[in-house]
């Protein structure tokens, strides 16, 4: 075919109906204006009713135009078993399996598509799997491509090398590597096996394009290798002639990172005494440190091991040994530079760094839970992504203020009155004033008052008549609320709360969230989504009828129930129950709440939130469908950035702070982690959008700790002993919070 014609408006693919143009997932999307055809390459390759009957230069890659039109017409009669829309051109090749689906839907449902031979496709029930022995270790290991942790579990997202039994990959990492390397360079990253490795990856659905590697197709791809990196990347460069100045055989000679070679430093800037001394950049030290953390296994420490500062951080003491006091634990931790700075590997390297490198640093590795599951880690990544999106939406907020007068004893009505007042604008800065002081914690910043207001408001909405269900809730049908447009107001309040720094809802059911972001017509409910126990029990009776006579008897007994749902129909076969159950579920879970759902969706469109939810479903699912994790010492540690002057003993001060967080988390303190956060920020939890400004810690020559809620800054005293530090912390925090509650 002649040169492709591309349509700027990106029409949908004629096979799957999706407008997405993502070559990595769906193949190249091409539009042929003269034939009025737009196709994803993978949708065409995987379609079950079409073959390449032409030469490579005929039609579309050998697929004749008339054959493509016939396949489109055939698919138009087939409904996708996943999204319930027409155009399902791909069918499972397993015998007796009649499932059909679109290519993008199949990817989401974790189907396997084999890009070889007959281009077979397998549904989520019949897809090929890798066999894992029960004797194998279930401890997570590193993906050899991205170096992140990967669970040793039979999951769609996890693949194991057929040639190296201890080599594991993320499916996504393998797919991107295959697309880049092509059939000539795609091989096992450990042993370089090509044939056996490619055969297994093709069987498991990895697409290996028949092309040369991307780096071989680029002109002068290796040109950069002919140049040596000559730049000092140390935060505080001491060279008066600039970062690019390089004088061989002097202290101003630039030395490159021994691991990556893409970062450099003057010898003097990193206190390197001679050229022979090794040096690694911050990024490489962080990667190696994380790798060593993940590979260590917890075991009891021998007495000799207790003297090793590095081991002390990574291992837990044996339960058979006497428990160390907080002071002795801190002495042990102090010997490990990983506690002080995550990018140092040698105990003395902290002192060799320039002062500016020690002014601000994260202490999160100190408390890192190395047994954290991948699911929790993934959830944290999603919440971080959602936080960044909310910060983008917050840019709409201007400096003009709108005051809300809130009565905590009647939170809903006072909030409703404030949101409906004539001068209320979601883009204005919200200032909250509580009109009743009884049983209320006073806050000295409007941020704290606003956070408390949104917290109380979310609790009220969660437990209101607008929702039904236990912990994971769906919308209910409240005619009076619908008449008063309260569903719209609730959606609007949630949107405003998230963008203005309020807490995450965390109580939505998966079915409700899917209806909001995908549309109710694209969602298939199940029995677990039915909130009414009586309705669920009736549907179960129909679903689990084992004979035609028992099914007909159950239908007769449920005559009024079926009539109310519009599902009365003659039952002539036992197979009729599946369609009946499906229609009942759609009615009671989705159709019944269509009006409240649409009103609620309109409210969520405030400040552009719903649009972002539709674009980033996974990220916002973590906020709407999952409760936030309990506040931990790790989270609190990661939240604060330490700032101090050069003359402060940063090591000892930070050590006291970390030891105190550990004591508080383990219950060895009269205050809680929530008390500490409230003392500094006026908030009892970390909002999804984060804090503005970001919380900081300063070690200053003050007598007692000071919490500056306007700046989210915690000023800590410099003490000689940990006990003195702990006593001052607890006395000040308890006294301050007690005074605010009185």
Swiss-Prot record:
The keyword Repeat applies. Residues 417-742 form the HECT domain. InterPro entries: EPHD, HECT_dom, Hect_E3_ubiquitin_ligase, PHD-type_Zinc_Finger, PHF7/G2E3_ePHD, PHF7/G2E3_PHD, Znf_FYVE_PHD, Znf_PHD. It catalyses: S-ubiquitinyl-[E2 ubiquitin-conjugating enzyme]-L-cysteine + [acceptor protein]-L-lysine = [E2 ubiquitin-conjugating enzyme]-L-cysteine + N(6)-ubiquitinyl-[acceptor protein]-L-lysine. Keywords: Apoptosis, Cytoplasm, Developmental protein, Metal-binding, Nucleus, Repeat, Transferase, Ubl conjugation pathway, Zinc, Zinc-finger. SMART domains: HECTc, PHD. Pathway: Protein modification; protein ubiquitination. GO terms for molecular function: ubiquitin-protein transferase activity; zinc ion binding. Its EC number is 2.3.2.26. A zinc finger (PHD-type) spans 78-127, 142-192, 236-285. A zinc finger (C2HC pre-PHD-type) spans 10-50. One of its GO terms (biological process) is protein ubiquitination. It is found in: Nucleus, Nucleolus; Cytoplasm. It holds the Pfam family zf-HC5HC2H. Ubiquitin ligase activity is mediated by two distinct domains, PHD-type zinc fingers 2 and 3. The use of these distinct domains may allow ubiquitination of different targets by each domain. The HECT domain is catalytically inactive and does not contribute to this activity. E3 ubiquitin-protein ligase which accepts ubiquitin from an E2 ubiquitin-conjugating enzyme in the form of a thioester and then directly transfers the ubiquitin to targeted substrates. Essential in early embryonic development to prevent apoptotic death. This is G2/M phase-specific E3 ubiquitin-protein ligase.
């Amino acid at each position: 075919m002649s040169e492709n014609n591309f349509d700027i408006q990106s029409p949908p693919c004629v096979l799957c109906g999706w407008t997405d143009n993502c070559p990595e997932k769906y193949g190249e999307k091409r539009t042929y204006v003269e034939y009025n055809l737009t196709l994803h390459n993978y949708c065409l390759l995987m379609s079950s009713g079409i073959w390449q009957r032409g030469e490579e230069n005929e039609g579309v890659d050998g697929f004749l135009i008339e054959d493509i039109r016939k396949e489109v017409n055939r698919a138009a009669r087939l409904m996708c078993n996943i999204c319930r829309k027409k155009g399902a051109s791909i069918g499972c090749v397993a015998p007796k399996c009649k499932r059909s689906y679109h290519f993008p839907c199949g990817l989401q449902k974790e189907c396997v598509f084999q890009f070889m031979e007959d281009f077979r496709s397998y549904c989520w029930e019949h897809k090929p799997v890798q066999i894992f022995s029960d004797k194998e270790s279930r401890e997570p290991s590193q993906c050899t491509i991205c170096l992140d942790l990967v669970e040793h579990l039979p999951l769609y997202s996890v693949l194991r090398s057929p040639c190296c039994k201890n080599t594991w990959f993320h499916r996504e990492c393998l797919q991107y590597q295959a697309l880049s390397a092509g059939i000539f360079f795609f091989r096992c990253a450990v042993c370089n096996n090509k044939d056996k490795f490619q055969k297994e990856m093709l069987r498991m659905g990895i697409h290996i394009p028949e092309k040369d590697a991307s780096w071989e197709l680029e002109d002068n791809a290796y040109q950069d290798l002919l140049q040596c990196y000559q730049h000092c990347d140390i935060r505080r460069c001491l060279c008066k002639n600039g970062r690019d100045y390089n004088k061989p055989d002097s202290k101003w000679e630039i030395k490159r990172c021994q691991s990556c070679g893409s970062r450099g430093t003057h010898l003097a800037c990193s206190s390197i005494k001679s050229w022979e001394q090794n040096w690694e950049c911050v990024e490489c030290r962080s990667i190696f440190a994380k790798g060593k953390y993940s590979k260590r296994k917890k075991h009891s420490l021998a007495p000799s091991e207790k003297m090793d500062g590095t081991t002390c951080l990574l291992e837990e003491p044996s339960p058979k040994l006497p428990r160390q006091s907080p002071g002795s634990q801190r002495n042990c931790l102090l010997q490990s530079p990983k506690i002080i700075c995550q990018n140092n590997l040698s105990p003395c390297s902290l002192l060799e760094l320039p002062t500016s490198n020690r002014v601000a640093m994260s202490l999160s590795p100190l408390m890192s839970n190395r047994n954290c599951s991948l699911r929790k880690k993934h959830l944290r990544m999603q919440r971080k992504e959602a936080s960044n999106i909310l910060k983008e939406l917050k840019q709409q907020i201007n400096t003009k203020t709108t005051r809300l007068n809130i009565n905590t004893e009647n939170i809903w009505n006072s909030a409703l009155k404030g949101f409906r007042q004539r001068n209320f604008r979601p883009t204005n800065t919200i200032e909250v004033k509580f009109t009743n002081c009884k049983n209320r914690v006073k806050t000295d910043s409007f941020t704290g008052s606003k956070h408390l207001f949104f917290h109380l408001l979310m609790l009220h909405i969660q437990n209101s008549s607008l929702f039904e269900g236990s912990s994971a809730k769906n919308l209910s049908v409240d005619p009076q609320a619908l008449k008063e447009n309260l569903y719209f107001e609730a959606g609007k309040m949630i949107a405003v709360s998230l963008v203005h720094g309020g807490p995450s809802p965390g109580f939505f059911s998966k079915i409700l969230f899917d209806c909001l972001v995908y549309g109710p017509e694209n969602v298939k409910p199940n029995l677990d989504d039915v909130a009414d126990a009586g309705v669920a029990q009736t549907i179960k009776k129909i679903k689990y009828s084992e004979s035609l006579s028992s099914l007909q008897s159950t239908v007769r007994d449920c005559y009024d129930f079926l009539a109310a749902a519009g599902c009365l129909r003659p039952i002539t076969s036992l197979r009729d129950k599946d369609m009946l159950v499906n229609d009942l579920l759609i009615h009671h879970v989705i159709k019944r709440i269509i009006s409240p759902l649409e009103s609620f969706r309109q409210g969520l469109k405030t400040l552009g939130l719903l649009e972002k939810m539709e674009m980033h479903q996974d990220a916002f699912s973590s906020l709407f469908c999952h409760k936030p994790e309990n506040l931990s010492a790790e989270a609190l540690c990661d939240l604060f950035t330490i700032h101090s002057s050069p003359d402060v003993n940063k090591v000892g001060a930070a050590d006291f702070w970390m030891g105190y967080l550990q004591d508080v988390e383990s219950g060895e303190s009269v205050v809680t982690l929530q008390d500490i956060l409230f003392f500094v920020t006026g908030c009892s939890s970390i909002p999804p959008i984060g804090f503005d400004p970001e919380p900081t810690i300063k070690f200053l020559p003050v007598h007692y700790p000071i919490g500056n809620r306007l700046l989210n800054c915690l000023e800590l005293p410099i003490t000689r002993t940990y006990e003195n530090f702990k006593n001052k912390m607890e006395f000040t925090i308890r006294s301050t919070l007690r005074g605010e509650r009185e």
